[in-house]
């Protein structure tokens, strides 16, 4: 009798998997049309993509927080728009979503470089930050692992979020120090998860945004974030090349809002 019940159970599971597979194949792939600001206003919905971290976008039970989330939500409310914000850890997927029209803008601090300007239109700079090395603090007997400066990166493996703008800087460093730096791109984790992995000893080095690293360093008493990988750079939101009117609308609003007391309170909340 038990054997029959087992067969029935297995048969039911197999049938369920077949039904799910058939449904997934029959479900049409959602198509998106690239939009500019007038299209967004007509729809009443602003679609943004961001990175899930304590600075940009963070969900804690029923509350949503984050500098980029709160700032963009203020813009949306001022324009009577509903904000839809999607977290996406992969920079490449965020860029793909913008290009295909799935999202209207990337609302997380994105480094403004000559290369990134080839694919995105950037708002006026929102922040200044830089890429830093996350490593464990110097320990007796393990000093060989501690990096004092960029010249000591030769032969080391740096873990970086896949598609991160930090990759370009690391490749430049390879030329500058005339030595090999191994790069391990990670697509399933963000910078905060990489920090936890360094702290736990799973990896030795990661490259993260300084603002995110400083916001989380209090959680890890054994971490050091004092070695710079890049110089200070501008960070901004990015919109698609096909959305110049959206860019102008964002910039006009940001120019006014960043002078307000509300913005000063918001900035102080996330950047002390």
Where on the chain are the PLM-derived regions?
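Extracytoplasmic small-molecule ligand-binding "clamshell" domains
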Residues: 8-9, 26-110, 114, 118, ...
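Periplasmic-binding protein-like
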Residues: 52, 127-135, 140, 187, ...
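Hydrophobic membrane-insertion alpha-helices, especially the h-region
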Residues: 8-22
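A ligand-binding cleft/hinge motif common to bilobed small-molecule-binding domains
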Residues: 92, 96-99, 108-119, 169-176, ...
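Ligand-binding clefts/hinges and TM-proximal coupling segments of bilobed small-molecule sensing domains
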Residues: 18-30, 163-186, 221-226, 257-272
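Hydrophobic residues within well-ordered alpha-helices
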Residues: 75, 98-99, 153, 197-199, ...
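Flexible hinge/capping segments at coil-to-helix
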Residues: 137-158
